[in-house]
Amino acid sequence: MCSRSVALRWGAETLATAGIEQARREARQLLAYALGITPEALVRDPEAELALGEYQGLVHRRAGREPLAHIVGRRGFWTLDLAVSPSALIPRPESETLIEAALQAFPDRTQVRTVLDLGTGTGCLLLAALTEFGGAFGVGVDLASEAAAVAAANARQCGLHGRCAFIAADWAESIEGGFDLVLSNPPYIPSGEIAGLAPEVALHDPLAALNGGTDGLTAYRRLLPNLPSLLNPGGVAIFEL
């Protein structure tokens, strides 16, 4: 047994030694997760005692470079709290720029009635877009049926399941046109560079969500020719690069 403050200090030191950049913040998140409380609640009683067992296991997993999101099973994106899975790319903060770009493209949010998300993963882009374009219906497509299932579960959790559908398909091959907004974060890492990525990415994100082929542009060559048939007149496509 030890106090929360001692456990937190040990966790932060262990993660820092393992090369985790935000060691104290992540140690705090793991301790809160182990206790079933919020990180903010930790400060209310820092000297409360706890058994280290579960927390030690979580810290060692993170020190082994397993992503924090996989350990706690969740990741925030835009205004949403989403479930994550090894079958889908962990949502990145930088992908929120696609939602920002969509809002700039359509200052009148009633203009967007249909949204397509190609390579939906957790559904983060589509679900975030639906929270902003309140009258829209969305379709999310992913090659991995497991990822499509995660996205559908996130839609239910967010109360958006009545406004979207998720399907497992090879990009847009089974999709007919008629979309005002097309979003996509396709794989764009050149094949030869994947091994040099952070272990959290190279070893834990699905390879299909990373591998952009020899030059990183394979998916774009597949997708771009389909855009004219997918977009409504005045429609906009926004891709992460």
Q: In which residue ranges do the predicted regions lie?
A:
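Conserved AdoMet
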Residues: L31-Q104
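Class I S-adenosylmethionine-dependent transferase superfamily signal
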Residues: A102, A129, V201, L223-L227
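Mobile active-site "lid"/loop adjacent to the S-adenosyl-L-methionine
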Residues: Y188-A219
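A general structural signal for well-ordered alpha-helical segments in protein cores
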Residues: L8, A27-R28, Y55-Q56, R65-L68, ...
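Conserved RecA-like P-loop NTPase ATPase core
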Residues: L30, A155, N185, V201, ...
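Conserved SAM/SAH cofactor-binding pocket of Class I
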Residues: E94-G196
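A short N-terminal interaction module
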Residues: M1-L50, E54-Y55
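Conserved Class I SAM-dependent methyltransferase catalytic core
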Residues: T214-L241
